[in-house]
Amino acid sequence: GVQTSNASSPDFQLLVRASLQQLIPELASGVPSIGAEGVDPLRGLPPIVHNSNGFKVQLDDVSISGLSATLINDVNVDLTSNTIRIQATVPGYITATGIQTTDAEIMGIPLKGSGPFTISLANPSLAVTLTGAPSAGPNGQTYLRLTSASAAIEPGTPTADIKGFFPQFPPLEAAASAFASVVAPDVVQSLKPTLDKWLGGVALQRAQAVFSSVSYDALFPGRTPAAVGLYRAVPGLHTLPLPLSAFAYH
């Protein structure tokens, strides 16, 4: 069975990683008991706004699907600096849809208009770092108040279907969409600083909702495997087939 393990031991990090991986199917539809909204699809997102070197684009009503296939590659929880680092990949595709408004010149071709978009990323990866500080809650328990979040995405292989540039001329509209898909890798790469900042903001907001709902000690007990803390926080999580004994001291 699971025994207590020092939080500074390598087992602690393995337990956190295993727990988070097993929690992902639950997170897909949301876990209200810990303040976690559904992530597949991921909705209710702020607009993505990019304006640099004559390339203006705004993405509204963004919805992202495919995140329930996320694989957690590595997790590091530093309970001294209150820093959490997560590295993950999504085998297959994640797909973002919404409404784009663009005013740009790409490879000498002017593109201006507004309409629906679909962007798919094949085998993307993401690194997220959350940093905070313990804060007293209204019930006398200690909660983690996040002070910063950063994210870095490696978009894998992007493809795009974008409409709204020539809505009155279907052949031109089809040509513009085909062109957008061809240049999608370069365009997404140019958007990367904006996407990283946006993803960091989303991670901060979504993670803070959890850390404001579940006390710091319940999530990461000092001498209790992190997974046990998650079991306490999420009713019914103990039914998931998590082989914790493989990672704990006996």
Swiss-Prot record:
One of its GO terms (cellular component) is extracellular space. Pfam families: JHBP. The keyword Cell division does not apply. Deposited in the epidermis and cuticle of male locusts during their sexual maturation. Keywords: Transport. Gene3D superfamilies: Haemolymph juvenile hormone binding protein (3.15.10.30). SMART domains: JHBP. Has beta-carotene-binding activity. May be involved in the transport of carotenes from internal tissues to epidermis and cuticle of the locust. This is Putative beta-carotene-binding protein. It comes from Schistocerca gregaria.
